[in-house]
Amino acid sequence: MDHPKLEEWKTVWRERRSVTMVYILLRISVVLVMLAQIFNGNFENVFLCVLTLILFMMPSVLEKKLDITLPNTLEIIILLFIYAAEIMGEIGAYYVTFPYWDTVLHTLNGFLCAAIGFSLLDILNRHSEARFHLSPLYLAIVAFCFSMTVGVIWEFFECTMDQLFFLDMQKDTVVNTIGSIMLAPTGGNTSTVLKNITDVIVVQADGTQTALGLGGYLDIGLLDTMEDLFVNFIGALTFSIIGYFYVCSRGENKFAKRFIPVANNSTRPKDAPSETPEKNKIE
């Protein structure tokens, strides 16, 4: 007869085999990249590798701290997101090589942040000591707002880094048409439009002029910020819709189950009233 501990390990392996395999493969990959960066003397990238290994532990920490179980699909998405952002994006320079790499990650970020916001509220919503009850629609709306708030705060961070350290986290965009009230000849509140812009000339304090050869006007981050927020919106909206139908189906939606964390000890006790008092119910 197998030892109980061995049986427990076998059960965990059967249930979480896919997550375990992805976790092991990604960690091995990060360690190999870190060794290569140490050999090349690039210690900034070594730090990113160490940070990635620490972030890989985040799903397990969340499960223990919040007493929840993350679905395999959601946990794999989180691990791949971390790897794609830090290793492939930063060290592999995918942000530069693939123009839409950052856009895809911001979309995933919106999805994952909505998942976090939704799960926290859903856990509280089903807790035996909860003093209010949110309807599925309100849960979805709050999860959506949580994700968008995180997205806005991140853009604040990018702007701060650009202003203080000139990191260009808010990527530039070359445009050929602009409109601005600062160009109005009368100084009024009427926007003046410049079309067919083909280059930007920088005039320095000593009178030196340098044509940048950009093929247009350099927009310093505005369009990138709006694009990031828009795709964050798409990711957040997608998860909020999934979460809404999950709650409406009382957790029976098989597709939604792949993305919704499950609270281990949040069910109401049997002697608790089946209906939440109307004064505490938000519909």
Predicted regions and their residues:
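Interfacial helix-loop-helix junctions of multi-pass membrane proteins
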Residues: 91-102, 148, 152, 156-239, ...
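Cytoplasmic-side transmembrane-helix entry/capping segments in multi-pass membrane proteins
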Residues: 50, 69-80, 103-106
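Alpha-helical transmembrane segments of multi-pass membrane proteins
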Residues: 56-60, 81-86, 143, 147-154, ...
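Structural signature of hydrophobic alpha-helical transmembrane segments
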Residues: 39-53
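Short, highly charged, low-complexity non-transmembrane loops/tails of multi-pass membrane proteins
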Residues: 253-279
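Membrane-interface helix caps and helix-loop-helix hairpins in membrane proteins
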Residues: 38-43, 65-68, 91-101
